[in-house]
């Protein structure tokens, strides 16, 4: 998915709060260093103007250890309205918001790569 989006000039946006945000920043930096267009945007920044960056076909990866983050729950709806591909990384398999995402990576004990 990432390679396909990259070859079509699309961007991967990564978002998460707290420690998940730290992981997201690191991941965006690592992907950029190997030539994949990636950028970290904090969840609250999306609702304060950053949604304008998104183009149809872009991907947003949402990272949350618990999956119980109200800001991320609101964002998923905004991304879906704009036809944005969503990927979730979560440590909690039972979170209902994961069902709304296009792809999910679940890691029980530890989320961090």
Give short role names for the model-derived ranges.
Residues 11-17, 21-113:
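Glycine-rich phosphate-binding loops that contact phosphosugars or nucleotide phosphates
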Residues 1-8:
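A short, well-structured juxtamembrane/interface segment
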């Amino acid at each position: 998915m990432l390679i396909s989006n990259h070859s079509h000039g699309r961007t991967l946006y990564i978002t998460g709060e707290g420690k998940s945000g730290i992981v997201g920043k690191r991941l965006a930096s690592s992907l950029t260093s190997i030539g994949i267009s990636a950028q970290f945007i904090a969840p609250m920044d999306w609702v304060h103007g950053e949604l304008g960056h998104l183009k149809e076909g872009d991907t947003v990866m949402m990272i949350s250890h618990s999956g119980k983050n109200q800001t991320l729950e609101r964002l998923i709806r905004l991304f879906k309205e704009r036809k944005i591909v969503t990927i979730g990384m979560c440590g909690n398999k039972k979170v209902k918001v994961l069902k709304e995402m296009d792809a999910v990576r679940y890691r029980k004990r530890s989320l961090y790569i």
